Curated annotation (Swiss-Prot):
It comes from Danio rerio (Zebrafish). Transmembrane segments: none annotated. PANTHER family: ENDORIBONUCLEASE LACTB2. Binds 2 Zn(2+) ions per subunit. Pfam families: BLACT_WH, Lactamase_B. GO terms for molecular function: RNA endonuclease activity; single-stranded RNA binding; zinc ion binding. Gene3D superfamilies: Ribonuclease Z/Hydroxyacylglutathione hydrolase-like, Winged helix-like DNA-binding domain superfamily/Winged helix DNA-binding domain. Keywords: Endonuclease, Hydrolase, Metal-binding, Mitochondrion, Nuclease, RNA-binding, Zinc. Zn(2+) 1 binds at residues 77, 79, 145, 164. This is Endoribonuclease LACTB2. Endoribonuclease; cleaves preferentially 3' to purine-pyrimidine dinucleotide motifs in single-stranded RNA. The cleavage product contains a free 3' -OH group. Has no activity with double-stranded RNA or DNA. Required for normal mitochondrial function and cell viability.
């Protein structure tokens, strides 16, 4: 168990973390939101969940402590523990009417609304640069966790705000394993010094953590394949496989684990290493080797 994350903490000369006050099995101690820059107006990365008054209190306190206001809100992806608080921030703070709230578009494109739909997202592109006093942020399209996921490179620190692509502890869930693995390789190529994750503590050895994620996913794929190879005459449902492959994982996390396992199975199916068993009312997989 990692150390308790304070509600507000200055992590560097240009980064202040404000905890989202929304702890849970998937959010760990809560969503990390970050005030970035050194001036009287700063960028807020991620906005926590909707209707969490404790977060609004913490954000107000952080802005007061650093004598600053919000210039621009950037959300790393569409999940509600990162976008939900936008509406509350707009409602509780005397923000500029022109305040931009930005993200990457969904793929395929779909309509996205903020609260009562009076404000629209401003869409960014891979490689875009956002500047504020004391900080330069470069957009990195990193799909996999979601189709619209971005990380942000803080150029002055060679640090990455990783959203939910990489967590401070444990491993991440994803929607598309192929895209996710490509995104990990992309982040590895950045050669960042540290990672400011969407959940959990700061990662100080970025390269090692990213390597760890890549190795873990490859090992998990091999583990799934080994179970099917060792039981070559048997077909398994995904829920049956979870109990074997994730036997060391707490049971309350098995649903999230099954989500990841299904993506591994789809990849293995595409690779021709496994096949779907015939004659069953539910999907069952078996080795094709």
């Amino acid at each position: 168990m990692s150390a308790v994350i304070p509600r507000i903490e200055q992590l560097s000369a240009r980064v202040v973390r404000v905890l989202g006050c929304n702890p849970g099995p998937m959010t760990l101690q809560g969503t990390n939101t970050y005030l970035v820059g050194t001036g009287r107006r700063r960028v807020l990365i991620d906005a926590g969940e909707r209707a969490v008054p404790e977060y609004i209190v913490s954000l107000r306190e952080a802005l007061k402590q650093h004598d600053t206001s919000i210039q621009h809100i950037i959300v790393t992806h569409w999940h509600h523990d990162h976008t939900g608080g936008v509406q509350d921030i707009l409602a509780h703070f005397n923000t500029d009417a022109e305040l931009r709230v930005s993200k990457l578009p969904r793929c395929p494109p779909q309509e996205e609304i903020i609260g009562d739909d009076k404000k629209k997202y401003s869409y960014l592109n891979d490689g875009d640069v956002i500047q504020t006093e004391g900080a330069t942020l470069r957009v990195l399209f990193t799909p996999g966790h979601t189709d619209d996921h971005m990380a942000l490179l803080l150029e002055e620190e060679q640090a990455v705000f990783s959203g939910d692509c990489i967590l401070g502890e444990g491993t991440a869930v994803f929607e598309d394993l192929h895209d996710y693995m490509k995104s990990l390789q992309k982040l590895l190529s950045i050669k960042a010094d540290l990672i400011y994750p969407g959940h959990g503590p700061v990662v100080h050895d970025a390269g090692s953590k990213i390597h760890e994620y890549i190795i873990h996913r490859n090992a998990r794929e091999q583990q799934i394949l080994n179970v099917l190879l060792e039981n070559s005459g048997t077909a398994f449902t995904s829920s049956e496989l979870v109990k074997v492959v994730y036997k060391e994982t707490p049971e309350h996390l098995h649903r999230a684990a099954e989500f990841n396992l299904l993506h591994h199975l789809r990849k293995l199916l595409k690779d021709g290493k496994i096949c779907l068993a015939e004659g069953s009312d539910e999907k069952k997989w078996k080795s094709n080797l």
